[in-house]
């Protein structure tokens, strides 16, 4: 489980990094950069364990103020990086998946 969490952490923070860096690349380099990231992300995703029943894990989605407050209490800098990346990705792309992932990351921190 720890290996899977490590992989997911880097998929999310990698997506955040690509989004942040794309505007700085020459236009001709953007599509190749996305293709390279997509290939790496697909390879990493393929290594992750799958739930047998296909049902999503239950998680209480917290408001961002609570998520960030809990993240700052963590002694694991990976939690803070993941929460920051999720917050930035939700702000730029929308979708509740980011707050759901961040809520799961801080679920054990109170």
Task: List where the protein language model places each region.
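Mature, well-folded catalytic/scaffold domains that follow N-terminal targeting or propeptide regions
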Residues: 1-110
């Amino acid at each position: 489980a720890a290996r899977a969490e490590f992989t997911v952490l880097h998929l999310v923070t990698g997506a955040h990094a690509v989004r942040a860096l794309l505007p700085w690349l020459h236009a001709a380099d953007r599509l190749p950069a996305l293709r390279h990231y997509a290939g790496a992300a697909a390879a990493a995703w393929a290594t992750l364990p799958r739930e047998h029943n296909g049902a999503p894990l239950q998680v209480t989605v917290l408001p961002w103020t609570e998520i960030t407050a809990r993240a700052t209490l963590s002694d694991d800098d990976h939690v803070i990086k993941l929460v920051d990346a999720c917050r930035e990705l939700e702000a730029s792309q929308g979708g509740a998946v980011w707050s759901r992932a961040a809520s799961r990351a801080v679920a054990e921190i109170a």
